[in-house]
Amino acid sequence: MKSCSARLVALVVRYSGNMSDLRDVIIVGSGPAGYTAAIYLGRAGFNPLVIAGALTPGGQLVNTTEVENFPGFPDGVMGPELMDNMQRQAEKFGAEIVWDDVVSVSNNDVTGVKTVSVDQGDVFETHALIIATGSEYRKLDIPGEAEYSGKGVSYCATCDGFFF
């Protein structure tokens, strides 16, 4: 078993500079959908690469206090804790995580290879690409919307409906 420092050096060497190697599967997004895909792919013998994002990995759940409607947590779970657990489970099954933002995706129509470039300059290639970038709230930009957000203005009926 490699020591932590040996693994860190291997990761730094592997992810430094402009490189391109064919990956089994690349998953763009580190929310529940991205990590679930990574877990199932890892268990199936693939080596998924998750491009998690540089600033807000973990999706919208990292900004959620208590998640009460996720199976297996009858007393609820904090959003960041749930996402940390999902990340660890994905890594347990062989997922590699890159903390960077995707800047471009292209497809070679002849070979079917998808090329994913990230902000730090690295380039990754794959035949299978999963886009799991989630969603964002659609705001109306009307007077009082920001002021009353969470105080009567809600963006998630299944999340907040019982409050009203």
Region locations from a protein language model:
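Short, positively charged and aromatic/hydrophobic N-terminal segments
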Residues: 7, 14-15
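FAD-binding core/adjacent interface of flavoenzyme oxidoreductases
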Residues: 19-28, 44, 49, 56, ...
